[in-house]
Amino acid sequence: MSKIKVEELTKIFGKKASKASSLLSQGKSKTDILKETGATIGVNKASFSVEEGEIFVIMGLSGSGKSTLVRLLNRLIEPTSGKIWLDGKELSSLNKKELLEVRRKSMSMVFQNFGLFPNRTINRNVEYGLEIQGMDKEEREKNAAESLALVGLAGYGDQYPSQLSGGMQQRVGLARALANNPDILLMDEAFSALDPLNRKDMQDQLLDLQDKMKKTIIFITHDLDEALRIGDHIMIMRDGSVVQTGSPEEILAHPANEYVEKFIEDVDRSKVYTASNVMIRPEIVNFEKDGPRVALKRMREAGTSSVFVVKRNRELVGIVHAAEVSKLVKENITSLETALHRDVPTTGLDTPLAEIMDTISTTTIPIAVTEDGKLKGIIIRGSVLAALSGNEVNVNA
């Protein structure tokens, strides 16, 4: 079961919402409806689901409806129509008391504007939500201290917001959201006001926290690079409507339409694709106990000049080259040991391409992709170039 499920969620702003809704059902555009009724389509029949423990990024340009949508999820803005389920419970069925409980304990928000109280210390800012809940002083101080430590601000509790940099203030905002241990974090352009260096630091911080805490995070941004860097799934919006939803790799490889194609045209794909996206299955491998004649026969049949050597469980041992193996055959040597090169370039399945581009450009042999020491695939320059140019790589090739 999904943590959050949204079905046909719609928000129309204005007095003629009913007429606007009827025009919307007829397929009228947002602009036409505005001209005819004066009503604004904030969100247009959005449907999606968010799995527990994932970072789900909603992105789009200004006016796309992304910030309205995130406020519909906790009913800070009431939907015109549609359904929202949280852990299988439909939110529109909740009364005011139940909804307040959801906002207090299940969801927390982090905004672009830090929203810190200048007259409160950092500790008291982080404690604020817990104080409103009526938590006793000792427990909320403990929770605040733990949250500040999580975001790297241990020891700053007695300072005031004016004494902290913008990046540090945003960490305080994140700590405040984490203090009541919510299941879900709603982050609306949380890092957009920061300079590029601080923004990257906060992205790293968020990913580190996610490794530890496994929160369900809905992250709003207009920055595609940010979305691709942190998102498990990305939903792109335009004029209140959902244009495409998918993993970063799916969106880059299969853009839904021209709008998405234009959106992603300047993306540095090397920062998004990982080794697993561009590796191919090796045509042949040679087992460690197989001798030079077997290895040479396999290379000749496959038309390759080298072959990786593995144990029976596919644990990588090294690589041998045809010229050196041929020499062993001529000398009637029955072991590959003297021709075996154990120091081969390797990488993990989840390594971003950007981190191995230097190796790819300088090595004369394929890069071995391993998991727990076992050979999973190989990376050749051709597969990398295909991926970076937007062509799909066949991992079974």
Swiss-Prot record:
Residues 28-264 form the ABC transporter domain. Coiled coil: none annotated. It comes from the Bacteria. The complex is activated by an osmotic gradient or by low temperature. GO terms for biological process: amino acid transport; carnitine transport; glycine betaine transport; response to cold; response to osmotic stress. Pfam families: ABC_tran, CBS. ATP binds at G60, L61, S62, G63, S64, G65, K66, S67. Part of the ABC transporter complex GbuABC involved in glycine betaine uptake. Responsible for energy coupling to the transport system. Involved, with BetL and OpuC, in osmoprotection and cryoprotection of Listeria. Can also uptake carnitine when carnitine is abundant in the growth medium. The complex is composed of two ATP-binding proteins (GbuA), two transmembrane proteins (GbuB) and a solute-binding protein (GbuC). This is Glycine betaine/carnitine transport ATP-binding protein GbuA. It comes from Listeria monocytogenes serotype 1/2a (strain 10403S). The lineage of its organism: Bacteria, Bacillati, Bacillota, Bacilli, Bacillales. The gene is gbuA.
